[in-house]
Amino acid sequence: MAPPTRIGLAGLAVMGQNLALNIAEKGFPISVYNRTTSKVDETVERAKQEGNLPLYGFHDPESFVNSIQKPRVIIMLVKAGAPVDATIKTLSAYLEKGDCIIDGGNEWYENTERREKAMEEKGLLYLGMGVSGGEEGARNGPSMMPGGSFDAYKNIEDILTKVAAQVDSGPCVTYIGKGGSGNFVKMIHNGIEYGDMQLIAEAYDVLKSVGKLSNEELKEVFAEWNRGELLSFLIEITADIFGIKDDKGEGYLVDKVLDKTGMKGTGKWTVQQAAELSVAAPTIASSLDSRFLSGLKDERVEAAKVFKAGGVEDTLSDQVVDKKKLIDDVRQALYAAKICSYAQGMNLIRAKSVEKEWDLKLGELARIWKGGCIIRAMFLDRIKKAYDRNPNLSNLLIDPEFSKEMIERQSAWRRVVCLAIGAGISTPGMSSSLAYFDSYRRERLPANLVQAQRDYFGAHTYERIDIPGAFHTEWFKLAKSKI
């Protein structure tokens, strides 16, 4: 019989398997369990094939829990919602006071807070831990965002710091904060990811539809961008995608992929939280809307027929463009819009941190996103430095370095958006990011008229720019008295 293991992991889908193997490879003996026992056997076999790693499989929850040294630490990687509650119920029947459960899935933060409270009443510790990096990251080093019981974090800190992605500033993991902060931060990470991916897709559309770049040229362009300021995981994989030939037919695989984007819900949660917190996040919101519209494939096919019959083609005009100039303009537009997406995400995190008194460190979040995760990018180091310079920075756009870059790139950004509008190509991410930038940098907006309208029909009052206090005007009476 094997000696007690250091940790347990329940839930052996792709992420669970790979994280378990990563933990074992780092020298921590691990017990694994899955309700479908074939997954247990599959994981044990992989551990043997990948170097006789210290991984032990169990087919029933009681023997699984009893195989782990005390105080026990168990990571769950199961589907969010009811499956998490069911797994907790199964495991907690065999756990003892001081043991710890960690939810490593994409869970709604309030569910984590509810579960932490329920576990505390039983004498158990609980963490909600966002894990980013996909299957490759889980196996070789993810970015991890644990929040909840600090005592629970200390029980597993030695493992997490070894298992996480490693960058020049240390492991890509840190204790995020109290309650559901870890899950909340991971949710916003995913919202930023939505924005990032949408902006890249729009850059691709403009280059292909207006610039007429081939897949070979697109591969070269994105590979070149990945050697500069846009260096990131998403730009890297985009270059890779453009180079893959279709193994089931002629041409390139990307052109055969149905233009219908799926989603699992974290982007929607992010936009809902933006509304709840009254934080503008148009880049992220437009990326979600774009996914909704992509899902209307059949309707779009019919709409295209209707408008083509009326003379409105897919692309409105074949514009003659300087290809080299266009590529450089799109690069600058993508970078500037990307800054807006990250600024919106960070503002959401800060607003929630204030509301919940989490005291989150935005610079440290940028640091742990530098490696392992899907949004890892070179410029995250500069975001960290911006918050190091000013922890109370109200918006990334006004950091001295980032504001300078926005000023330098805004002309190219406007050219790209105008070009796309002229060609009838939708760029909701770039356009909404530009509108966000323009609204934020203007001292006075036309909101005065909107507030006057509200006071006219609803007596909602208004403030004046010259006299303090709340005012109401009988707009209707004044207007009609002049007739």
Swiss-Prot record:
Q: Name one GO biological process term.
A: pentose-phosphate shunt, oxidative branch
Name any GO cellular component annotation: cytosol
**Pfam families found in the cross-reference section:** 6PGD, NAD_binding_2
Q: Any transmembrane segments, and where?
A: none
- Its EC top class is oxidoreductase
Chief localisation class: cytoplasm
Q: What is its EC number?
A: 1.1.1.44
Q: Per UniProt, which keywords does this protein have?
A: Cytoplasm, Gluconate utilization, NADP, Oxidoreductase, Pentose shunt
Entry-linked SMART domains: 6PGD
Catalytic residues identified in the record:
K186, E193
Molecular function (GO) terms for this protein are:
NADP binding; phosphogluconate dehydrogenase (decarboxylating) activity
Q: Does the keyword Transmembrane apply?
A: no
Locations listed in the record: Cytoplasm
InterPro entries the record matches: 6-PGluconate_DH-like_C_sf (IPR008927), 6PGD_dom2 (IPR013328), 6PGDH_C (IPR006114), 6PGDH_Gnd/GntZ (IPR006113), 6PGDH_NADP-bd (IPR006115), NAD(P)-bd_dom_sf (IPR036291), Pgluconate_DH (IPR006183)
Known catalytic reactions: 6-phospho-D-gluconate + NADP(+) = D-ribulose 5-phosphate + CO2 + NADPH
Q: Which of this chain's residues are annotated to bind NADP(+)? A: G11, L12, A13, V14, M15, G16, N34, R35, T36, V78, K79, A80, N106
Origin, by domain of life?
Eukaryota
Per UniProt, substrate binds at: N106, S132, G133, G134, H189, N190, Y194, K264, R291, R454, H460
User: Could you tell me which PANTHER family the record lists for this protein?
Assistant: 6-PHOSPHOGLUCONATE DEHYDROGENASE
Task: Fetch the NCBIfam families from UniProt.
Answer: gnd (TIGR00873), PRK09287.1 (NF006765)
* Function (record text): Catalyzes the oxidative decarboxylation of 6-phosphogluconate to ribulose 5-phosphate and CO(2), with concomitant reduction of NADP to NADPH.
Oligomer and partners: Homodimer.
Per the record, the similarity remark reads:
Belongs to the 6-phosphogluconate dehydrogenase family.
Its protein name is 6-phosphogluconate dehydrogenase, decarboxylating 1
Which species expresses this protein natively? Spinacia oleracea (Spinach)
